[in-house]
Regions:
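Feature marking well-ordered beta-strand scaffolds used for ligand recognition
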Residues: 1-313
């Protein structure tokens, strides 16, 4: 029988070329499988006894060694023969050899999730959304109180030396970065344009002054938006948000919640949340189009002017 690192396989119409375990530092050595730390139960205990001992979902979560996604792999980006694998705990850089066999070059431990990655030239862009993220990539978390040490947004790394990636820029955002999409660049002005999709909670404006939550009638809210980020290739430290358009707004009424406002569609239908965020945006540059997966909606944007995306209804 297969175990954690030598699992048995079932495969159809595919060929497994190679399989690599997570590098050191990219998993919890006390819980390498990432499972919940469940206490052993007496197999002879009757059902009634089990019910008495059972904990709530919240209490069970507190008993885990580490949250289930703390070390999960998420996204892969490529540049020539280089492969970068993002994760909730940082990223790993591999060199691809003949036959597609990857060899680890370096690992960067930088927690915060989700770890969505893109590569443009010698710059690696990474999404960070969790409240444990820190500006300095530390593993100790950032606490529960507002602090300038917390980081949620877009990180930029210089990977010109694959063995020694260096963080050269950050962009703090109100809802972090679940995913991001490189829209264009670098153009003649030497700038990369990125669309950021934040789906996490809105941070306290004591921590970031421009952030406001769901306050009725307050159009400053960080909800119902994407962020347009500009990255100067020659000086990524000057990267910034240039605008945060309300892409779900009703053009006639100006209401920010211009699409689905939440609820159900009638008897025996599921209840869904209001459309106020995008999970991911895919870009089709030659057609000047972007497609967003946004709270259950598939949305097309005209990005002829990438600084001013227009929703196509």
């Amino acid at each position: 029988d297969g175990g954690l690192f030598d699992a048995e396989e079932a495969i159809l119409n595919l060929e497994l070329i190679t399989a690599l375990p997570k590098p050191a530092g990219c998993f919890d050595p006390k819980n390498p499988s990432g499972r919940y730390n469940e206490k052993e139960k007496n197999e002879e205990a009757n059902e009634e006894e089990d019910k008495k001992k059972a904990k709530s979902t919240e209490d069970a979560y507190k008993d885990t060694r580490s949250p289930m996604l703390s070390f999960s792999n998420t996204d892969i980006a490529f540049r020539d023969d280089v492969l970068i694998a993002g994760s909730y705990h940082g990223f790993n850089i591999y060199r691809m050899f003949e036959g597609g066999i990857p060899s680890l070059v370096s690992s960067v431990i930088c927690p915060g999730g989700q770890g969505d990655v893109s590569v443009v030239g010698d710059l690696l862009i990474m999404s960070v959304e969790q409240t444990r993220g820190r500006v300095d990539c530390g593993r100790q978390g950032a606490g529960s109180e507002p602090t300038p040490e917390r980081f949620r947004g877009i990180r930029i790394f210089d990977i010109s030396d694959l063995r020694r990636p260096k963080q050269v820029g950050i962009v703090q955002t109100c809802r972090g970065s679940h995913t991001h999409s490189v829209v264009s660049g670098p153009g003649a002005d030497g700038k990369i344009i990125v669309y950021n999709s934040g789906t996490s909670s809105v941070r306290d404006n004591e921590e970031l002054a421009s952030c406001y939550g769901d306050i009725p009638g307050d159009n400053r809210t960080a909800l119902f938006r994407i962020d347009i980020i500009e990255i100067p290739v020659n000086d990524p430290s000057k990267s910034k948000i240039v605008s945060s358009p309300t892409v779900f707004a009703d053009e006639e009424t100006g209401a920010l919640a211009g699409l689905w406002r939440g609820g159900d569609h009638g008897e025996d239908t599921q209840t869904t949340r209001v459309t106020e965020e995008c999970h991911d945006i895919t870009v089709f540059p030659s057609a000047n189009l972007a497609a967003g997966a946004c709270s259950g909606n598939g949305i097309l944007f005209d990005i002829t002017d990438p600084y001013d995306p227009q929703r196509l209804d």
